[in-house]
């Protein structure tokens, strides 16, 4: 009875330890500020009879042929490595400066009793005042 209890406790400790290690490794991988992206270029590549590979002329100039060791067919892929640790963390003023702003345009005036006003859909008085302001 004591042996079974001791074995059960050992198994429980090993499971808990395994979960803890898995969580720590996963968190460490997420903290890494490096990104490796792969994009399919929209075409495949094949090995020619002389041993060279067909050119990859896909979406961008960085497309290269990637294939398994003995395969005669491969995929044209574009790879990019970005190390975000080289960039500073943006401040609030940087984020505020990068926030998109609405364009300044003439907005249509809606009639509360029906569709837009006749003509261009703009109140002529507002347009006249804005044009005078611009001149």
UniProtKB/Swiss-Prot annotation:
**Region entry Disordered: which residue ranges?**
88-112
Keyword Disulfide bond in the entry? The reply is: yes
List the disulfide bonds in this chain: 41-63, 45-65, 56-76
Q: Where does this protein reside within or beyond the cell? A: Secreted
Carbohydrate attachment sites? 44
Q: Which UniProt keywords apply?
A: Disulfide bond, Glycoprotein, Secreted, Signal
A GO molecular function assigned to this protein is:
C-X-C chemokine binding
Keyword Secreted in annotation: yes
What are the boundaries of the signal sequence?
1-31
Please state the protein's primary subcellular location. secreted
In the UniProt record, which is one GO cellular component term? extracellular region
Briefly state the protein's biological role: Salivary chemokine-binding protein which binds to host chemokine CXCL1.
- Record-given protein name: Evasin P1134
Q: Please give the organism.
A: Ixodes ricinus
